[in-house]
């Protein structure tokens, strides 16, 4: 098992990664000061049916434990479920010394974290991720719900007390969720650990390789990339924006195709390829785009859909949180491991996106 220490200006906490990580949960709760009054577990239907009772049984405590379960899917990261969770919290007499446990993937981590950030102006919470994708979202304290006009537009920065990454929970994931989460692993390698990138190319030939000791190795390498960036810039005023590599187009694809119709990781994978495609033009460098594209396709990541309106996608990219005064800001790559946030004119993005779309269709 590997423990990773996270240090930000507002809080320090640990990420427990391994096959026995859940055994730490009771100790984490018992060591909290002031002592925890009661616990609300927030989960979704798919995860709850598999793992909720396991977590309840692992909590060897005297305090009341209850659950709030929402339907599964990104579209459930909504104001309606956020409001309903507050209602449940009030009905079950949560107070400022209560604890919320987020049991699920990134959607649940975001929703439960935002409930924790806002209930009585902020209470404690613990992340118990059940997906590979959540190795990114569970660390760093960004919590949010979606708005019909954009993803993660209503939210806060609220760090967890701990992250308990019990890897056996991931074994029930369908292949599309392994692929989705692996995109964020690739992102962390490309922007912050080139050695990990080369290791992935050698050791992860198929998604089936993302298991057991290799999985633990990947998590203990990818999470510190994010941790190091968050330590420098907790509230995304500077270098934390680098973590959005691939997300400008990725989020636009999610919005245009409809939340749930493309996984977050599939969107980010296409977005990273476009960022590399555009980076080669902007920086006049060779980033081996063609080789990268074939590597991505090998894992089953989608191509850029040929029937999408480039004009509509550019409009959605202008709504991205990095955008400033209606100007698109993208994270571009100078070389592997070196990225920057760059202001890009609409026309440049439009021309490049048309060329990228054509390239993805023809080859």
Curated annotation (Swiss-Prot):
Residues involved in Zn(2+) binding: 184, 247, 264
One of the protein's GO biological processes: aromatic amino acid family biosynthetic process
Pathway(s): Metabolic intermediate biosynthesis; chorismate biosynthesis; chorismate from D-erythrose 4-phosphate and phosphoenolpyruvate: step 2/7
A GO molecular function held by the record: 3-dehydroquinate synthase activity
Pfam families reported for this sequence: DHQ_synthase (PF01761), DHQS_C (PF24621)
Residue sites binding NAD(+) per the record: 72-77, 130-131, 142, 151
Co-factor binding comment: Binds 1 divalent metal cation per subunit. Can use either Co(2+) or Zn(2+).
Localization terms from the record: Cytoplasm
Keyword Iron-sulfur: no
Catalytic activity entry: 7-phospho-2-dehydro-3-deoxy-D-arabino-heptonate = 3-dehydroquinate + phosphate
Keywords carried by this UniProt record: Amino-acid biosynthesis, Aromatic amino acid biosynthesis, Cobalt, Cytoplasm, Lyase, Metal-binding, NAD, Nucleotide-binding, Zinc
Listed cofactors: Co(2+); Zn(2+); NAD(+)
Keyword Cytoplasm recorded: yes
E.C. numbers: 4.2.3.4
Leading EC class: lyase
Cellular component, GO annotation: cytoplasm
Record-stated family: Belongs to the sugar phosphate cyclases superfamily. Dehydroquinate synthase family.
NCBIfam families in alphabetical order: aroB
Record HAMAP family: DHQ_synthase
Function as written in the Swiss-Prot or TrEMBL entry: Catalyzes the conversion of 3-deoxy-D-arabino-heptulosonate 7-phosphate (DAHP) to dehydroquinate (DHQ).
PANTHER family: 3-DEHYDROQUINATE SYNTHASE, 3-DEHYDROQUINATE SYNTHASE, CHLOROPLASTIC
The name this protein goes by in its record: 3-dehydroquinate synthase
Species per Swiss-Prot/TrEMBL record: Bacillus thuringiensis (strain Al Hakam)
Gene of this entry: aroB
């Amino acid at each position: 098992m590997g423990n990773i220490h996270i240090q930000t200006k507002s809080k320090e906490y640990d990420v427990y990664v391994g096959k026995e990580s859940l055994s730490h949960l009771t100790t984490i709760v018992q060591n909290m000061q002031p002592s925890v009054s009661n616990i609300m577990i927030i989960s979704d239907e798919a995860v709850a049916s598999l793992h909720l009772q396991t977590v309840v049984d692992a909590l060897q405590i005297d305090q009341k434990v209850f659950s709030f379960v929402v339907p599964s899917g990104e579209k459930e990261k909504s104001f309606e479920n956020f409001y309903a969770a507050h209602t449940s919290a009030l009905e079950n007499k949560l107070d400022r010394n209560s604890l919320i446990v987020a049991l699920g993937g990134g959607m649940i981590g975001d929703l439960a974290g935002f409930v924790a950030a806002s209930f009585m102006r902020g209470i404690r919470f613990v992340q118990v991720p059940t997906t590979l994708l959540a190795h990114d979202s569970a660390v760093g304290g960004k919590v949010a719900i979606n708005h019909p006009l954009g993803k993660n537009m209503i939210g806060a920065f609220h760090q967890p007390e701990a992250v308990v990454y019990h890897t056996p929970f991931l074994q029930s994931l369908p292949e599309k969720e392994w692929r989705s989460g692996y995109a964020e692993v690739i992102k962390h390698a490309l922007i912050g650990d080139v050695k990990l990138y080369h290791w992935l190319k050698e050791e992860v030939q198929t998604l089936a390789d993302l298991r057991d000791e290799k999985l633990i190795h990947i998590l203990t390498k990818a999470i510190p990339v994010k941790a190091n960036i968050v330590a420098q810039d907790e509230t995304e005023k500077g270098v934390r924006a680098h973590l959005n590599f691939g997300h400008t187009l990725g989020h636009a694809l999610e919005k245009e195709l409809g939340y749930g119709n493309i996984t977050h990781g599939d969107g980010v994978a296409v977005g990273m390829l476009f960022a590399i495609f555009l980076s080669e033009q902007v920086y006049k460098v060779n980033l081996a785009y063609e080789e990268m594209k074939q590597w991505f396709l090998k894992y089953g990541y989608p191509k850029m859909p040929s029937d999408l309106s480039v004009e509509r996608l550019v409009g959605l990219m202008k709504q991205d949180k990095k955008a400033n005064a209606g100007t698109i800001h993208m994270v571009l790559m100078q070389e592997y491991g070196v990225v920057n946030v760059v202001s890009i004119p609409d026309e440049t993005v439009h021309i490049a996106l048309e060329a990228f779309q054509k390239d993805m269709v023809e080859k």
